[in-house]
From Swiss-Prot:
[4Fe-4S] cluster binds at C149, C152. Transmembrane segments: none annotated. Homodimer. This is Fe/S biogenesis protein NfuA. PANTHER family: FE_S BIOGENESIS PROTEIN NFUA, IRON-SULFUR CLUSTER SCAFFOLD PROTEIN NFU-RELATED. It comes from Citrobacter koseri (strain ATCC BAA-895 / CDC 4225-83 / SGSC4696). It comes from the Bacteria. Keywords: 4Fe-4S, Iron, Iron-sulfur, Metal-binding. Binds 1 [4Fe-4S] cluster per subunit. The cluster is presumably bound at the interface of two monomers. GO terms for molecular function: 4 iron, 4 sulfur cluster binding; iron ion binding. Its cofactor is [4Fe-4S] cluster. HAMAP family: Fe_S_biogen_NfuA.
């Protein structure tokens, strides 16, 4: 469910050493399955453990996950990265905003999942997003861009060199992607 790197475990163990005996960590998702989902880590004293929690035992600690958050933390990774600028704890949870879909789910659901979990987080750095409008009978994914992508001069490159390549690599049954967006350049456009 969740992978916690050795460096992150050591970081948590150091923090937990200063807490009440028996205190562990809790990993959770607020507003799971929505565009506003946010992940977090907190201390979990012994009296805060619920019977319905999942206990994930690691070498240096135990991480508790509540029943509601569990499916949205599938494939989550926690790491502690140190570079010349300092140290940082990172939590990546690709399924926090949308529950992972089965490999045999309809093509529309699998494409939508990939857009939400892999493509949109990349576009969000520029204030953009993409939505799947339909998949045609001919096998084309019809997409609509929004936010900073609408009117951006790089949208064609993003569509063909980024999104289309990733989708065709993952879903060979697709023939390509098409952009439905009526692009209007403005203050919102990234480039």
């Amino acid at each position: 469910m969740i992978h916690i790197s050795d460096a992150a475990q050591a970081h948590f163990a150091k923090l937990l050493a200063n807490q009440e005996e028996g205190t562990q960590i809790r990993v959770f998702v607020i507003n799971p399955g929505t565009p506003n989902a946010e992940c977090g880590v907190s201390y979990c004293p012994p009296d805060a453990v619920e019977a319905s929690d999942t206990a994930l035992k690691f070498d240096l600690l135990t991480a508790y996950v509540d029943e509601l958050s569990a499916p949205y933390l599938e494939d989550a990774e926690i790491d502690f990265v140190t570079d010349q600028l300092g140290s940082q704890l990172t939590l990546k949870a690709p399924n926090a905003k949308m529950r992972k879909v089965a490999d045999d789910a309809p093509l529309m659901e699998r494409v939508e999942y990939m857009l939400q979990s892999q493509i949109n987080p990349q576009l969000a750095g520029h204030g953009g997003r993409v939505s799947l409008m339909e998949i045609t009978d001919e096998g084309y994914a019809i997409l609509q861009f929004g936010g900073g992508c609408n009117g951006c001069s790089m949208v064609d490159v993003t569509l063909k060199e980024g999104i289309e390549k990733q989708l065709l690599n993952e879903f060979p049954e697709l023939k390509g992607v098409r952009d439905l967006t009526e692009h209007q350049r403005g203050e919102h456009s990234y480039y």
